[in-house]
Design a protein with these regions (language model features):
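Cleavable N-terminal export/targeting peptides
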Residues: 1-36
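Short loop/turn motifs that connect adjacent beta-strands in outer-membrane beta-barrel proteins
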Residues: 29-40, 69-79, 115-122, 165-169, ...
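Outer-membrane beta-barrel domain signature
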Residues: 33, 49-53, 72-74, 94-99, ...
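Residues that define the transmembrane beta-barrel architecture of outer-membrane proteins
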Residues: 40-42, 54-60, 77, 100-106, ...
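Transmembrane beta-strand segments that form the barrel wall of outer-membrane beta-barrel proteins
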Residues: 42-52, 80-87, 127-129, 163-179
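Residues on the lipid-exposed face of transmembrane beta-strands in outer-membrane beta-barrel proteins
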Residues: 46-50, 62-66, 108-112, 127-131, ...
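Solvent-exposed loop/turn segments connecting transmembrane beta-strands
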Residues: 47-60, 92-98, 172-186
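Gram-negative (and chloroplast) outer-membrane scaffold detector with strong preference
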Residues: 58-139
């Protein structure tokens, strides 16, 4: 059963994505779609994560990335620094005991963006570190307390891509380790 906070996050994320997608699809149809990931590019986005942490069926999160350096000696790619956060929540019960879990992974990755001839597609791979904020409680008729889990540092490895369907908006997806197994969402260009 999802918490009311998790339901509110899902509703707000869905509403923002629907409004943004509608506006950007109209703009893309008017202007024609072209990708533009390059030096100085900055975006922000929302994602839904699937798989990866305990009994959570989905997570909700955000992404921010800034392209900081051209790498002519490494295939002429671009180095981007990405900050990410996600929110997972779930509960379970068994033989009179109930558990409640909340995970909030916050991480930073260095992403290498491959240069392709197709400007609408932006593939990347990334490595980084994160900090997992964990809250877990157990309760029964005779005992209430924590679950013994603690927050801590974790490693991140991911591969993903953007597909630009307008100059300022892209579909986003990544797979990897460190949080959700699969994240999908939408990013919006800021600069």
């Amino acid at each position: 059963m999802r918490s009311s906070f998790s339901r509110k996050v899902a509703r707000v994320t869905t509403a923002i994505a629907c409004v943004a997608v509608t506006a950007q699809v109209a703009a893309a149809q008017a202007k024609g779609a072209a990708g533009n990931f390059g030096l100085g590019y900055t975006d922000v986005g929302v994602v839904v994560g699937l798989g990866g942490l305990g009994g959570a069926s989905a997570s909700f999160g955000g992404r921010f990335e800034h392209a900081i350096k051209a790498l002519p000696d490494l295939g002429n790619g671009i180095l981007g620094i990405q900050a990410a956060f996600d929110y997972y929540s779930w509960s379970a019960s068994f033989t009179g005991y109930g558990w409640s879990y909340k995970y909030i992974p916050v991480g930073v990755t260095a992403n290498y963006h491959f240069k392709l001839d197709e400007p609408k597609i932006d593939p990347f791979v990334g490595l980084g570190l994160g900090y997992n904020i964990i809250s877990c409680s157990v309760n029964s008729g005779t005992f209430n307390g924590d679950c013994g889990y603690s927050s801590g540092i974790y490693a991140i490895a991911r591969a993903g891509a953007r597909y630009f369907f307008s100059p300022s908006m892209a579909l986003y997806g990544d797979v990897g380790a460190g949080g959700a197994t699969l994240n999908v969402g939408v990013t919006f260009k800021l600069h």
